[in-house]
């Protein structure tokens, strides 16, 4: 049985990955920050060596130093290391669709942070897997996901303003978890982009989610925000958000 050490279990993505890994028969060991501080570099190294994971998946927020330290120890111990990054590394002055050959130019602190983590991870561990993901969609309320954002906008304003000129990187959370878990089963080291959006606008996605969930939202079309941060990379086999949502509302 594979043992996977997983950070970020209080977030949105890590619990979905944990569920998928357990479904595949893996043992999941959550990183408890209360027991092992990310700021204690010796404790970090000691903990990884004690757990002896076959892989470590890093989803949590934390310092770039922590990400680098974990990547380095995994390289020394022969454990796979997967860092979950973000489409936010691309600045709003850059226009997609993006491929792995497009160099990020982050325009905010979060994007700069994620890009720094990527660079330090790959410098510390040349066998690391780095995966940039987009906005996650869970077909339910709660957590940091698109449905929760849309539902809150509906509650606050009585409608949802959605641009037809914004093409966001996004994917269904469960599909993201499947792809990330699958990457541990033989994906070569390197950079990957994980995006299930086939090219839909934010307005199209919001309308489709309203229909799929029978949410009763009022989605108003506008052109106020213009950006394409869609990412293109077919290697991890993402399912189209359009296909998944169409299937959901057709049931």
Task: Give the ranges of each region predicted by the language model.
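Mid/C-terminal beta-alpha module of Rossmann-like enzyme folds, strongest
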Residues: 158, 179-231
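SDR active-site strand-loop-helix element
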Residues: 7, 31, 59, 81-87, ...
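NAD(P)H-binding glycine-rich loop region in Rossmannoid oxidoreductase-like domains
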Residues: 36-77, 89
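NAD(P)-dependent short-chain dehydrogenase/reductase
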Residues: 119-168, 175
């Amino acid at each position: 049985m594979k043992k996977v050490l997983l950070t970020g279990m209080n977030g949105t993505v890590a619990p979905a990955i944990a569920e998928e890994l357990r479904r595949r028969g893996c043992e999941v060991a959550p990183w408890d920050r209360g027991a092992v501080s990310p700021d204690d570099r010796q404790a970090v190294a000691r903990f990884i060596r004690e757990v002896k994971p076959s892989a470590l998946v890093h989803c949590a927020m934390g310092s770039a130093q922590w990400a680098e330290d974990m990547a380095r120890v995994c390289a020394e111990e022969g454990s796979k290391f997967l860092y979950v990054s973000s489409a936010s590394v691309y600045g709003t002055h850059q226009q997609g669709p993006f491929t792995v050959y497009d160099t990020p130019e982050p325009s905010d602190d979060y994007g700069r942070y994620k890009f720094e983590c990527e660079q330090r991870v790959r410098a510390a561990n040349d066998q690391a897997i780095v995966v940039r993901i987009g906005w996650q969609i869970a077909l339910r309320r709660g957590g940091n996901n698109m449905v929760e954002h849309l539902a809150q906008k509906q509650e606050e304003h009585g409608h949802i303003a959605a641009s037809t000129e914004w093409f966001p990187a996004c994917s269904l959370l469960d599909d993201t978890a499947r792809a990330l878990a699958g990457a541990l089963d033989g994906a070569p080291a390197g950079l990957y982009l994980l995006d299930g959006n086939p090219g839909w606008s934010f307005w199209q996605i919001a309308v489709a989610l309203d229909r799929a969930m029978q949410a009763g939202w009022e989605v108003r079309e506008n052109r106020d925000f213009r950006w394409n941060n869609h990412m293109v990379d077919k290697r991890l086999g993402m399912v189209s958000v359009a296909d998944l949502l169409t299937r959901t509302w057709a049931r």
